[in-house]
Amino acid sequence: MKELIKDPLNLIIIGVAGQGNVVTSQLVCDALVREGYLVTFGQSYPAQQRGGSVINYIRISKEIQCSPIIPEGRADVIVAMEPVEAIRMLAQFGNPDVITMVNPRPIQAIDITGSKAKYPGLNKVMEDIKDLSAKTWVINATEEAQELGNAIMANVILVGALVGCGLLPLERKSLEPVIEERFPRAFELNMAAFDRGVELAREQE
């Protein structure tokens, strides 16, 4: 069995509503529990966004049951399905050792869309993410999912990438039953998305 890179491991998964980040979190949690890990899951909703995004907190350990909310400045891994959301999480939960995985497809959340503020330049956002992270994995999950036939599978691609780069102590066989239960009529397609995520992560090693 693979080992945690840190115990407990504090993982944050964030995205704009509709990107499937809650499903991403559920797949990760279910697979970890099946492998015998103690997993605590929590959520919060940024007030300024009025439903624009949801923060998913996942705390993983072999030894202890953690509280559901990750303290500020204590994230070990941040997975952002949208670049500006990565910056927000790094500002609040980042530290010199934090690892970030980001899908570089920008989506304007409610607070940006509803105001006069423009979405910041993507190149600058990506540079800032790298500057604020000890290690950054850029996974073009939306683009790859579209090539597979459905952009919503970006969430499964990111799960595959987390496994592929070794940030989660899981293997393909850990996710197969979880993905089959969640997507029984699209199991093979979602496993293809998972496998593509693994490949994308390993290409950056």
Describe each model-derived feature in a short phrase.
Residues 1-205:
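Active-site cofactor/cluster-binding pocket
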